[in-house]
Amino acid sequence: KELCYILDELQSVGINTVFFQARIRGEVFYSSRYEPWAAVLSHGQEPGYDPLAFVIEECHKRAIECHAWLVTFPVGSNRQVKKQGRSSVVARHRSWCKQLSGEWFLDPGNPAVKDYLRALVGEVVSKYDVDGIHLDYVRYPDNAMKFPDSDSFRKWGSRSKSLFRWREDNITGIV
């Protein structure tokens, strides 16, 4: 009911687009074959309804577009990842992930990560009538100079490119 009230208020002031955060750090607000339910919603368990489907339906009833907002590379803190257990992307695909300052990130330099993010987006656009996709945190962490991807650079980087240029190309290639 609260969401419907908010959407009614948005409609009344002429808002025509809502960005619904469908993926937070390694968890989602929709039924996914790739990632667990968001712990903040239902402690990582299936909540008995599909929040993304619900918000899309309610937005469309009001002629409001609904875009799925997906956090890309950040996966969460050590504590968040530990709570997700075996269902976390870190547990399932450790080689795709890097840790920096107590936070986990998908490694933009690993080609499998591009495929994984493409699969997440594909899952959303094939299952839901979203009006758009918003990719968030499509960048290296703030302290990127310390990002531990030297092994990825050696494996997938080009000798003709600097680390900086290679990283730029990784982000561009994902977008």
Model-predicted regions and their roles:
Residues 1, 54-57, 67-127:
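Active-site-adjacent "subsite" loops/lids of carbohydrate-active enzymes
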Residues 2-28, 127-132:
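Catalytic domains of carbohydrate-active enzymes, especially glycoside hydrolases
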Residues 5, 13, 112, 116-119, ...:
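A non-catalytic, amphipathic alpha-helix used as a structural packing/dimerization or gating element
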Residues 6-7, 24-71, 157, 162-175:
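Aromatic-lined substrate-binding rim segments of carbohydrate-active enzymes
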Residues 10, 18, 59, 66, ...:
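Conserved, mostly hydrophobic/aromatic
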Residues 21-23, 69-73, 109, 135-138:
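Active-site-proximal beta-strand/loop segments in catalytic clefts of secreted hydrolases
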Residues 30-43, 74-101, 138-165:
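Aromatic- and acidic-residue-enriched segments that line the glycan-binding/catalytic groove
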Residues 116-133, 141, 159-160:
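Active-site and adjacent substrate-binding regions of carbohydrate-active enzymes
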